[in-house]
A protein has these predicted regions:
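Ubiquitin-like/PB1-type beta-grasp interaction modules and other compact soluble beta-rich domains
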Residues: 1-72
Length: 73
């Protein structure tokens, strides 16, 4: 199982945490497609705490964290 954690605005209309089977999920992009999250919505993408790209492969027991761009001033 892969644990997917969504933060801030990415949670809107979605769960905070997902558990996904690795059968159909091969990359972070597959996760984003499954959750209907566009690349432009994600500013920081971590796998097990390390910065990665959407095309990075995922493995069983990985923790994927997706963060949107954060604004403020």
């Amino acid at each position: 199982m892969i644990e997917v954690r969504l933060f801030a605005g990415l949670r809107q209309g979605r769960q905070k945490i997902y558990q996904m089977e690795t059968d159909s999920i091969k990359t972070v992009q597959d996760i984003m497609d499954t959750l209907d999250i566009q690349r432009s919505e994600v500013n920081i993408l971590l796998i097990n705490g390390f910065h990665q790209k959407p095309e990075t492969p995922v493995n069983d027991e990985d923790v994927v964290s997706l963060f949107p761009a954060v604004g403020g001033g």
